[in-house]
Curated annotation (Swiss-Prot):
PANTHER family: CYTIDYLATE KINASE/PANTOATE-BETA-ALANINE LIGASE, PANTOATE--BETA-ALANINE LIGASE. Homodimer. Beta-alanine binds at Q57. NCBIfam families: cyt_tran_rel, panC. This is Pantothenate synthetase. The keyword Nucleotide-binding applies. ATP binds at residues 26-33, 144-147, 173, 181-184. SUPFAM superfamilies: Nucleotidylyl transferase (SSF52374). It catalyses: (R)-pantoate + beta-alanine + ATP = (R)-pantothenate + AMP + diphosphate + H(+).
Length: 283
């Protein structure tokens, strides 16, 4: 596996080859990331992965400085997966001048849910992803469904900018007890880790209530959301949101859309101690 930090060197290595299958990451790799590498390979070699902890998507009180950086362990894992190139730029490589131009997703998608609680997050994500796409020029790029809203925003960005890349969704990988794998799970204490699977259990209960009730009105949807928030809050969680939304655009479903049976997704973000976890479940 070649490890490259310079943009021009990366382009030189990729010139004359089939366009790559690309998986962007922030490192601290786990089985969820590795499953995306395998999915990328199904869409063709060479597979290019990137590791870059992107300052632009962290807020002033978030964990940029403490975000786990495990480069050597990540290299070992990527080599075992047969990744052709690891693109690991420094901040100076990717942002040689201050990044004055940003990609700002539309408010109706970028300022809701995660965007409401992490202002500027998706602007930072879209900016770095567009820049990485420019560097790698991939044929396909794989993003995990665990970051459901991010996946949708990247897909829409690629479509609206007519980027010649297909966005491929990868399924969420979970621990045996159901907790979605995440680099931030390492922040959990032993007691918190034992409690953490209650998040996906709550989403499954929400899904079952929706299915059992054959819900067709927005008021009942709101009541189910409030019940789930109260249930987790009673266990010590601090909820940012539990929201039942349309899969197509993450907007709240109208009565007419509910009656038409439009596909829904449940999304959540919640803090357990100091650790903020996100998850989702399609209905």
């Amino acid at each position: 596996m070649k490890i490259i930090s310079d943009i021009q060197e990366l382009r030189d290595h990729l010139r004359g080859q089939n366009r790559a299958s690309f998986v962007p990451t922030m490192g601290n790799l786990h089985e969820g990331h590795l499953s995306l590498m395998r999915l990328a390979r199904q869409h063709g070699d060479p597979v290019v992965a990137s590791i870059f902890v992107n300052r632009l998507q962290f807020g002033p009180n978030e964990d940029f400085d403490s975000y786990p950086r495990t480069m050597q362990a990540d290299i070992d894992k990527l080599e075992k997966e047969g990744v052709y190139i690891l693109f690991a730029p420094t901040e100076r490589d990717l942002y040689p001048q201050p990044q004055e131009y940003r990609v700002d997703p539309p408010q109706q998608l970028g300022d809701i849910l995660e965007g409401e609680f992490r202002p500027g997050f998706f602007k930072g994500v879209c900016t770095v992803v567009l820049k990485l796409f420019s560097c790698v020029q991939p044929k396909v790029a794989v993003f995990g469904k665990k970051d459901y809203q991010q996946l949708m925003i990247i897909h829409q960005m690629a479509k609206q900018f007519a980027l010649p890349v297909e966005i491929i969704p990868g399924e969420t990988i979970r621990a045996e007890d159901g907790l979605a794998l995440s680099s931030r799970n390492g922040y959990l204490s032993a007691e918190e880790r034992a409690e953490a699977p209650e998040l996906i259990k709550a989403l499954k209960e929400v899904r079952q209530r929706v299915l059992d009730s054959n819900i067709r009105d927005a008021k009942t949807i709101s009541e189910i959301e409030k019940l789930a928030v109260a249930s987790l809050a009673g266990r010590g969680w601090k909820l940012d949101y539990i929201a039942i939304r349309q899969q197509s655009n993450l907007a709240p479903a109208s009565n007419e859309q509910l009656q038409a049976g439009d596909p829904l997704v449940i999304l959540t973000a919640a803090k357990l101690g100091k650790t903020r976890l996100i998850d989702n479940l399609e209905i």
